Amino acid sequence: MLQNNIELDLKTKLIEAGLTQKEIAEQIGVSLAYVNRITKGREQIVNKTFMKIMDELGYDVRLTFEKREDQSAV
């Protein structure tokens, strides 16, 4: 199973933007507690929320799918 590091990426992007969890929560209309749970990995981030956060931070998000050459890994 693949694991993602969305929580770590989110923390990094907030630091790079100089924003606090409280500030981003206010900007996207969610609670500080919710953002905190996401960044600590205690709650799965919803795609809609992730997209709002990345939009506020000035990022375009692209999702790509690439077919594996080795089908035995599926």
What do these predicted ranges mean?
Residues 64-74:
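Short, charged recognition helix plus adjacent turn
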Residues 29-44:
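Recognition helix of helix-turn-helix/homeodomain-like DNA-binding domains
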Residues 48-63:
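DNA major-groove recognition helix of helix-turn-helix/homeodomain DNA-binding modules
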Residues 21, 32, 47-50:
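Helix-turn-helix DNA-binding elements, focusing on the entry/boundary residues of the two helices
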Residues 18-19, 36:
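Glycine-centered signal
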Residues 24-25:
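Short alpha-helical "recognition helix" segments of helix-turn-helix
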Residues 1-17:
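A short, Lys/Arg-rich alpha-helix, primarily the initiator
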